[in-house]
Amino acid sequence: MTDHARPHLIEFPKLGLSDIGYISVAENDDKLLPFAIQRIFWTYYTPESIVRGRHAHYRTQQVIIAATGRITVTTEQAKGDIQTFQLENPQVGLYIPPFCWHTMLYSHTAVQLVLASQPYDEADYIRDYNQLRALWQQA
């Protein structure tokens, strides 16, 4: 395992006007994303009592965006570094590096859009928190 960047917010350009609406764009050749997008997925209608995530990845990097609603993301990295982020602006994304445990809570109206650096591969998921802690200790 190598040392990776910390979770951090990325602000995408906001183009438009209040009377016509706005657009924000993420492209593979811009300097905002630290990876090329290989997969995009979204979640919606998640009950407010459900905690999603509860995993980390070996290789995959992600940017989580609250397209609508509010998402509370809690991240944990090696050495107990815990951060909590409130996502509620569609022009702001949260970068999640590999080996970063993360959980999400949603407002009922939240639509979560995720940009990912890898295609889906179940073998890339670390779903056991104790296994991740052991990997952190080996680093």
Question: Where are the regions a protein language model picked out?
Answer:
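Non-catalytic, conserved peripheral segments adjacent to functional cores
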Residues: 1-92, 121-130, 135-139
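Residue-level recognition of conserved beta-strand positions in structured domain cores
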Residues: 75-77, 106, 114-116
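Conserved metal-binding segment of the jelly-roll/cupin
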Residues: 87-108
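A short hydrophobic beta-strand segment most commonly corresponding to one strand
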Residues: 110-124
